[in-house]
UniProtKB/Swiss-Prot annotation:
Catalytic activity: a plastoquinone + NADH + (n+1) H(+)(in) = a plastoquinol + NAD(+) + n H(+)(out); a plastoquinone + NADPH + (n+1) H(+)(in) = a plastoquinol + NADP(+) + n H(+)(out)
Family: Belongs to the complex I subunit 4 family.
Gene behind this protein: ndhD2
Gene Ontology biological process terms in this record: ATP synthesis coupled electron transport; electron transport coupled proton transport
Any GO CC annotation of this UniProt entry: plasma membrane-derived thylakoid membrane
Transmembrane domains' residue ranges: 6-26, 34-54, 87-107, 115-135, 136-156, 169-189, 210-230, 244-264, 276-296, 312-332, 333-353, 376-396, 418-438, 487-507
GO molecular function, a single term: NADH dehydrogenase (ubiquinone) activity
Pfam family, one: Proton_antipo_M
Location(s), subcellular: Cellular thylakoid membrane
Protein name: NAD(P)H-quinone oxidoreductase chain 4 2
Organism classification: Bacteria, Bacillati, Cyanobacteriota, Cyanophyceae, Oscillatoriophycideae
InterPro entries reported for this sequence: NADH_Q_OxRdtase_chain4, NADH_Q_OxRdtase_chainM/4, NADH_UbQ_OxRdtase, ND/Mrp_TM
Bilayer topology annotation: Multi-pass membrane protein
Iron as UniProt keyword: no
Amino acid sequence: MLTANFPWLSAIILLPLLASFLIPVIPDKEGKTVRWFALGVGLADFILMCYVFLQKYDLSNPNLQLVEKIDWVPQIGLSWAVSVDGISAPLVLLAGLVTTLSILAAWQVDRKPRLFYFLMLLLYAAQIGVFVAQDLLLFFLMWEIELIPVYLLVSIWGGQKRRYAATKFLLYTAAASIFILVAGLAMALYGGGAMTFDMAELGFKDYPLALELVLYAGLLIAFGVKLAIFPLHTWLPDAHGEASAPVSMILAGVLLKMGGYGLIRLNMGLLPDAHIYFAPILAILGVVNIIYGAFASFGQQNMKRRLAYSSVSHMGFVLLGIASFTDVGISGAMLQMLSHGLIAAVLFFLAGVTYDRTHTLALNEMGGIAQAMPKVFALFTAGAMASLALPGMSGFASEITVFIGVTSSDVYSQTFRVVTVFLASVGLILTPIYLLSMLRQVFYGDGSSCDITNILPNKSNEQAVCFGTSCVLPHESEYSDAKPREIFIAVSFLALIVAIGFYPQLATRIYDVKTVAVNSEVRQAYTEIAATRQNIYAETQPDVSAKVASIFQ
């Protein structure tokens, strides 16, 4: 554990937080100044975190680094305890990149710009707080704070059903997060002594197996909602379908990853014994997510809802990796979170770019867009190839790593591994089907046989641009392809996707030392339980069905 000489992590959190409260007092009538201010703050914070991790972070150290701990409210055991390790560091960088580029993507926001950028910076700070908090109560507070800006960003700047989608998101996530608070209180109070929510100290406690199972189940619900695990996923398509593109970039690129992070940090890290019993369930849920998400995505005729269900499918690989009991599998789960964060962000951004021109997300109303927007077509195609795990893209590296982790696991029976990999492969086959069909519906064809729809008043039909079955009138008198700002955002994501695809160690070297340490603790717990609970583990390699059934005994 390395204590920081300077509060670097606090600075990374407080910079966007304090800057957000300056926005209301900045003199600006048209919102142009606050736009540049928010972008400058986001970029400065991202540069700061890059400097900290390049100069102050030791990649070879699996322990917590840059540790800061101050007794904040000692009466209830709350402390300002923040630090990073291999699990949190890459996700902090992901949050910084995605949020900064989403601010740039929101450049045309002209409705209540002060409030919009205030909420974006507040969300920026809360995201970082979730990933660096090492006090469970502080983690819960950051988790809750993050809900407020997301709710407002969706409900104010969303589509026609924005209030319904925002309320559904809030109810799902707020209700589920209660389990985090309950689990924290139970662990803090167990064993007597001074109350503490410090995760390191909570990890040293020896909880009864029955208590661990209950706490694990509660945390699984809380993180399962955020990770969009079936059947807790239904808020996600609605939220993405109604949220603006910059908000969808953060929802898919960062917020989903909080669920996976929580499973690794708390469920595996603090409750390794319970993880032994729940791991097969996670593997089964992962397969269900992969297949269900793929089928559901193919059935969507709204572009953003199709991408949302594809996220449900891709998060199934995170569950498989976490459940694998192998170093390679957990590494693949981390790589999948990072890869999907980049891929989902660029796809939702390009969906927003397309909507800005066509004013529709209905796939059956599009067609032939490639002729009018060749640059967007090229960028969208590259993003789709990454999502369907084309070799040379980060999606391929992450998913093949998860498969290797599952197949090489010595915990599950051969039958279980073969069936799991086979069913997950079905999802891989379905992925190009729903993505390539979306590309065909949106970009291919000539768009010649269309009915003109005057969606803007006082405009001539001669200014219409035709797509598929309808023609629309863009905001500008002349139709335009992707602009330099939009190209820069998309290329920034795609460059990283390709770089990680060709050289995965760009990402894996950040966290592999830590994921090996986490898996080592789980493997040790597995060995101890297998030696003492012969009624559950018939042999060194346990029977999975008995393992799952034991949970309900």
